[in-house]
């Protein structure tokens, strides 16, 4: 199921959602221009430094030494040099492809404005970043030996989706359903988002059970799960913004 738009009304202008959209797209364009001008190797080197590498975090927490229980798992995989903790933040502003950034920004556009309307601009930004952090931590804890840089705003946006699930469960979402034939249908948000979460959880569980490769399979399902759960919890902890109707702010 692919969400296309929702019918939840908002009062305020989603300035922070717009800023996040512009920032993520702008940084991806920087990555793309780096590839065009200097080759794929330059972009890969940039991503290895600023992407989240769980094995690098594990080694950092072990004081710079590879723990014995990871030696066998790592095998011949090389842990790239770079900061260990900074990528928990920087990785959520990087993306792997045009499809990756478009899909993430589309979801943010659909669900972010209403959550921002509820929380206020800066509380919304704080929650976005915390959900991204939660997604990164979850991914790291369940992939301690992974040497593949994880990038993307998916954990943060999953958190916004989790918050939307709590705030607007009955809002209708126009959804593209590619089942035998492609058709469009309005579905309750709790159905669309609940289905998405179950798919991410089952995919993450299946990958964890079946994969013997510490580099992972390229999709950080557990970051999605961790971010979504963080959004479910945090939206209940953060106060809603005072209602201001003048000037649409």
Where is each model-derived feature located?
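A detector for small-residue-rich transmembrane helices and their helix-helix packing motifs
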Residues: 1-249
């Amino acid at each position: 199921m692919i969400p296309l738009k929702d019918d939840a009304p908002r009062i305020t202008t989603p300035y922070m959602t717009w800023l996040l959209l512009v920032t993520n797209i702008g940084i991806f364009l920087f990555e793309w221009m780096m590839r065009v001008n200097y080759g794929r190797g330059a972009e890969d080197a940039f991503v290895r430094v600023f992407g989240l590498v769980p094995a690098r975090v594990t080694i950092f927490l072990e004081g710079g030494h590879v723990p014995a229980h990871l030696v066998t798992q790592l095998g011949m995989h090389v842990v790239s040099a770079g900061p260990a903790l900074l990528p928990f933040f920087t990785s959520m502003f990087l993306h792997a492809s045009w499809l990756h950034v478009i899909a993430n920004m589309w979801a943010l556009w659909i669900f972010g404005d209403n959550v921002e309307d509820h929380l206020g601009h800066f509380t919304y930004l704080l929650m976005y970043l915390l959900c991204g952090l939660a997604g990164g931590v979850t991914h790291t804890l369940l992939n301690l030996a992974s040497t593949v840089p994880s990038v993307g705003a998916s954990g943060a946006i999953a958190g916004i989706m989790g918050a939307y699930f709590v705030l607007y469960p009955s809002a209708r979402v126009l959804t593209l359903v590619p089942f035998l034939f492609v058709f469009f249908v309005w579905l309750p948000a709790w159905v669309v988002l609940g289905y998405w979460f179950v798919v991410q959880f089952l995919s993450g569980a299946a990958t964890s059970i079946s994969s013997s490769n510490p580099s992972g399979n390229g999709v950080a399902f557990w970051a999605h799960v961790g971010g979504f759960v963080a959004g479910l919890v945090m939206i209940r902890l953060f106060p809603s913004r005072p209602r201001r109707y003048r000037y649409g702010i």
